[in-house]
Amino acid sequence: MAVSCVERGYAETTVEEVIARAGISPEAFARHFNGIEDCGFAAINLIVAEIGAVASAAWSSDSSEAESVLLAIKALLELLAARPSFAPLIYIQGRYAMPADSYAPYRASIEVLASMVDRLRAYAADKDQAPKTAAAGVLGSAGMAMRRAILAGNIERLPELLPDIVYGVMVPFLGQKEALRYAGQARELLNEGG
């Protein structure tokens, strides 16, 4: 489903094409899905689950909240680069081309990620420095940078956005100096290849 959506767009993806790509019978498809919308919704849910898994796995009691956020962003970008059909489906097709219900899992995942990012507020010198909507705002900005890269055909280069996204996510909570420090750590991780 995801590959077909990337190649043809959701509107042009057919059950027949999905069946052919998956190598299954129409009966097998019908046992699992009530049509292309249902299949698309399942694909979105799968991607959201994988994003949640890699983001959660990045959190460690051995790391600070900010380091965990950095590692979660890194893991997300690496997942999307490694699974190139995921990024356009979740960030483009699922958001703009599929039925409105398909956007709900993405929105729910953003709320979970925003609550993770908002935990940085506890480490801010001025706890009221960032507005209440800062976490959602920085994730929206990160999503826009990712969508631009996806639309430009640079999915495999998504991990290169790590320093910029880390800076943008950290600055409202930790201030410029700390955000620059974590962006520098992100750049070092990229340069080390890990």
Q: What positions do the PLM features span?
A:
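Hydrophobic alpha-helical connector segments
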Residues: A42, S56-S85
